[in-house]
Curated annotation (Swiss-Prot):
It is found in: Mitochondrion inner membrane. This is Cytochrome b. Pfam families: Cytochrom_B_C, Cytochrome_B. The gene is MT-CYB. It comes from Cyanoramphus forbesi (Forbes' parakeet). The chain crosses the membrane at residues 34-54, 78-99, 114-134, 179-199, 227-247, 289-309, 321-341, 348-368. InterPro entries: Cyt_b/b6_C, Cyt_b/b6_C_sf, Cyt_b/b6_N, Cytb/b6-like_sf, Cytochrome_b, Cytochrome_b_C_euk/bac, Cytochrome_b_N_euk/bac, Di-haem_cyt_TM. Its cofactor is heme b. PANTHER family: CYTOCHROME B. Keywords: Electron transport, Heme, Iron, Membrane, Metal-binding, Mitochondrion, Mitochondrion inner membrane, Respiratory chain, Transmembrane, Transmembrane helix, Transport, Ubiquinone. Its main location: mitochondrion. GO terms for biological process: mitochondrial electron transport, ubiquinol to cytochrome c. Coiled coil: none annotated.
Amino acid sequence: MAPNMRKSHPLLKMVNSSLIDLPTPSNISMWWNFGSLLGICLAAQILTGLLLATHYTADTSLAFSSVANTCRNVQYGWLIRNLHANGASFFFICIYLHIARGFYYGSYLYKETWNTGVILLLTLMATAFVGYVLPWGQMSFWGATVITNLFSAIPYIGQTLVEWAWGGFSVDNPTLTRFFALHFLLPFMITSLVLVHLTFLHESGSNNPLGISSNCDKIPFHPYFSLKDLLGFMIMLFLLTTLALFSPNLLGDPENFTPANPLVTPPHIKPEWYFLFAYAILRSIPNKLGGVLALAASVLILFLSPLLHKSKQRTMAFRPISQLLFWTLAANLFILTWVGSQPVEHPFIIIGQLASLTYFTIILILFPIISSLENNLLK
């Protein structure tokens, strides 16, 4: 009998073991779809980004008009730009839901997979930030100025670090050039990190909603989950194209329709919606260095998840008190996102401070305590 090509060919063999004959737990739900959706987001962003880069000019005097030219004169340039800008939003929606799934079902106990995932999130955030600067509108310019300026809070080397990042004494042409270079490079770095992430995942196999070993009940990835993923792709691409065609500027900032002007400060400087929760935490602390540390901690705290797991059960599926705490945390993140979009005045200041305190308290203190309590209730 002739050997099966996909099982014997050196390259096809790798694809086969990762996407076709991969043993998968039979009971994984739609929450396990977001990994593949993130893959589609990454592919779409690289494709649209590459097409946009062919028409973009990384120069302060031409950047804004080159983006306008892409939208007006390049065939389907407006569509490519809208898909790229809104694709970033969908990327973050998917990654936040993916992290939430991992947090809820205890996937962080696969430490290597989880840690590479957190590094992926940080790289994605860096990519989105430098990308937001490229259109060189008012919010692009002032967002870059404010966020890069945060590094000046680092004792002793801060100011030197900021000037080194800027390539001068303010955000100017060298800054835009290097941000474009970084925005082009980082997605490929993300792609390589994704391969590392998947390698670690396939070492242990997928977790499942019950959080117990599924070795006795596994099914091949194809056709069962490839078809299930396809449904997810169709839903997400439908939502993305709907947003890009009907309301492309819904999630953007109107200030970015004005070319960057270093002499005029916008009334309210804020980042894109997906960074607002971290921005609210940054603003809630009056001290600059304290704010920067809280901002970093708001994301880096994810690295501590495996260490803070005190429950005898892996998932929250059968832990009602932890579930209540989880959804309180989710609501708290929505409050932080809302506060981050509001001006710095009463009552938003105190709401932001309380929500920031609640965020860290739930993750660092309440989750371990409640887990231990639930362990005692099992006795």
